């Protein structure tokens, strides 16, 4: 299975620890080390860590770098500083989401885009396509980086004792460069994909194993993609390729905060997003809780109580924290009403569900 798949610097660690390895976005990645529920609960209640070195990194440098980054991205990049990162979207001309990503301003005219692993090549091709109009140099630097995510309510106290900076006041998307961790130079970002406090750590690829092992020695639970998915779904955080796609806009996909179409600067997809901001989008993303027994999977139709199709499930799972069957779905905007009962078509059965908040973390 793994011969043709890409591997992170930690691949041998997965094998040695007996992790269950699966294909994900062209990579051989651990879906679980022990059990998804154990790993999920470690992050929800204590602290766990993920290898996210498969994520892509795209560097944009040059005299027009700040202009180019704004032209590519839907958020207002004027808010970026060399200590404040930003969640944003790479949109096409129709406002559809090519990828959702995080932007770091490393320095003047020096930016780093952190993109989803499965989309790295596609994103880089898109960036290259639009670069010639600007005085910029773009590079896919993914192989230079390792990335770990240390997440959970106890993550801050743990990391605080291991780095040479004060992390106590760091807020979401605050970051610091040139931080020393286990003797290695890292970028430390207060961010994650779990609904919990925590940090994402960017290091040189060659340092990834030493940093991972350092956390293992501090009894941090290694976690796989299975728990990463249940944690993000409980928190109502979208996954590109399911909840966000090239035919779903930020307003439809529930990430309107990452679109700023009223700014002066132009960006790709701006006119469509401006229209949706002013007039509303035809669809919206909602949280669902299934009232009947079953799991709502990606692509299952969502119906009104008369059996008319009004949307589809984009992600679904059984929430380890609450035991409830939860989902995210995209439905016609005028069908939305919090608490409304709907049906989900699960094979030949129609299961009752109700619209709830997307963030369904219950402790």
From Swiss-Prot:
Protein name according to UniProt: Aminomethyltransferase
Upper taxonomic lineage: Bacteria, Bacillati, Bacillota, Bacilli, Bacillales
GO biological process, one term: glycine decarboxylation via glycine cleavage system
EC number: 2.1.2.10
Domain of life: Bacteria
Keywords annotated in UniProt: Aminotransferase, Transferase
Organism of provenance: Staphylococcus haemolyticus (strain JCSC1435)
Keyword Transcription regulation: no
The family this protein is said to belong to: Belongs to the GcvT family.
Subunit-structure text: The glycine cleavage system is composed of four proteins: P, T, L and H.
Entry's transmembrane regions: none
GO terms for cellular component: cytosol; glycine cleavage complex
PANTHER family to which the protein is assigned, alphabetical: AMINOMETHYLTRANSFERASE, AMINOMETHYLTRANSFERASE, MITOCHONDRIAL
Function: The glycine cleavage system catalyzes the degradation of glycine.
Reactions it catalyzes: N(6)-[(R)-S(8)-aminomethyldihydrolipoyl]-L-lysyl-[protein] + (6S)-5,6,7,8-tetrahydrofolate = N(6)-[(R)-dihydrolipoyl]-L-lysyl-[protein] + (6R)-5,10-methylene-5,6,7,8-tetrahydrofolate + NH4(+)
GO MF annotation list: aminomethyltransferase activity; transaminase activity
InterPro entries assigned to the protein according to its UniProt record, in alphabetical order: GCS_T, GCS_T_bac, GCST_C, GCV_T_N, GcvT/YgfZ/DmdA, GcvT/YgfZ_C, TrmE/GcvT_dom1
Gene3D superfamilies, sorted: Aminomethyltransferase beta-barrel domains, Aminomethyltransferase fragment, Probable tRNA modification gtpase trme, domain 1
